[in-house]
Amino acid sequence: YSSAASDVYKRQFNRSARDNIMYGNPNATEKDLIRSSRQAEAHEFIQDLEDHRGRKGYDAHLGEQGVKLSGGQRQRIALARAILKDSPVLVLDEATSALDSEVENSIQNALELVMENKTVLAIAHRLSTLAKMDRIIVLSDGQIVEEGTHKKLLKINGLYRQYWDKQSGGFITTEQAAE
């Protein structure tokens, strides 16, 4: 059994960007490292990194718990690590919470490929992260109150639908989102 988690803050080390990502799979090749970084939308900003000792790109150190990175950058490093690990079980804990909408959309598209043929446990308050999942379980006060696909949950007009309507803010109709 093997799993990968996109645990954003607690697993960033004061090591290089390369070491932080390769932690997911120490035997991975440089090509694998770059591929996973690109899929996580991290490659571009990693290339621009420079630490206080002049180390650049993938060799730049990130600081303790990734302190030198933004929340979104830390998230993308953690996602790159999870992608590189390529486990049959993937745990996404608020995987897109610190990302702007454009990067979130790109990562969601990449995650669709990564999640294929895997068991994914996704914890999310941003419901757009869950919309393409095969099965969504809605919890309230520690109890399962609804379950189904995004489309089914929108139709039953319950708690999930209420949250979806609040988050979509009327920019798109619920019917458009269900298509």
Task: Enumerate the predicted regions with their spans.
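Conserved H-loop
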Residues: 39, 43-55
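Short loop/turn and capping residues at structural boundaries
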Residues: 48-51, 73, 141, 164-165
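ABC-family ATPase nucleotide-binding domain "signature/switch" substructure
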Residues: 6-7, 15-22, 31-40, 56-157
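Cationic, histidine-enriched alpha-helical/coil surfaces that engage anionic ligands
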Residues: 26
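Generic alpha-helical structural context detector
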Residues: 34-38, 47, 161, 165
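C-terminal boundary and immediately downstream tail of ABC-type ATPase nucleotide-binding domains
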Residues: 155-179
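Single conserved hydrophobic/aromatic residue that forms the stacking wall/gate
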Residues: 1-9
